[in-house]
């Protein structure tokens, strides 16, 4: 599939992004301003997650699978290449869990021949970057890398699928 070019949106986040799906499914009594404040207050976890996503993107682009022998290499990349203090990694995330998720995600994305970090666009206020995506034979596959303590939410993937349908003019019933 030839995806549209949205390179001008790389490393940007939309207000109405699938990653912050709570705007679309806000529970009654939830204050969105408090939610956004809490998200930004966990800056190291976000920085580490961004670095792990970048490592995953590079691995998928080069089709280089991760294995248990590269765990220390990933830790070294975080501390040396991304200049994240080792203490911040220890306090900010469960590195063993994050590495396990990273390994599964990278290896699965390579196995399914997925494209990493694909921007799906509807408007300047509603776009998001799918961590890994493929669309072949009317089968849409979207994977989302989770490296933190937050729960995985199907709503985020549903919004990515909706953005795909809107951008590429597919009706949901046309997709398996």
Locations of the language-model features?
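Charged, glycine-rich intrinsically disordered N-terminal tails and low-complexity linkers that flank
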Residues: 1-75, 79
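Catalytic cores of nuclease domains that cleave nucleic-acid phosphodiester backbones
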Residues: 44, 48, 55-142, 148-155, ...
């Amino acid at each position: 599939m030839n995806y549209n070019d949205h390179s001008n949106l790389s490393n940007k986040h939309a207000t109405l992004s699938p990653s912050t799906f709570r705007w679309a499914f806000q529970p009654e009594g939830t204050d969105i301003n408090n939610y956004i404040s809490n998200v930004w207050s966990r800056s190291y976890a976000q920085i580490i997650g961004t670095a792990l996503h970048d490592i995953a993107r590079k691995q998928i682009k080069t089709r280089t699978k991760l294995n248990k022998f590269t765990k220390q290499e990933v830790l070294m990349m975080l501390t040396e290449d991304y200049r994240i203090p080792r203490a911040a990694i220890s306090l900010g995330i469960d590195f063993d869990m994050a590495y396990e998720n990273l390994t599964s995600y990278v290896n699965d994305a390579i196995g399914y021949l997925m494209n990493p970090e694909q921007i799906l666009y509807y408007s300047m206020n509603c776009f998001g970057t799918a961590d890994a995506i493929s669309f072949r034979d009317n089968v849409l596959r979207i994977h989302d890398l989770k490296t933190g303590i937050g729960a995985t939410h199907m709503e985020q993937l549903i919004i990515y699928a909706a953005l795909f349908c809107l951008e590429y003019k597919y009706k949901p019933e046309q997709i398996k």
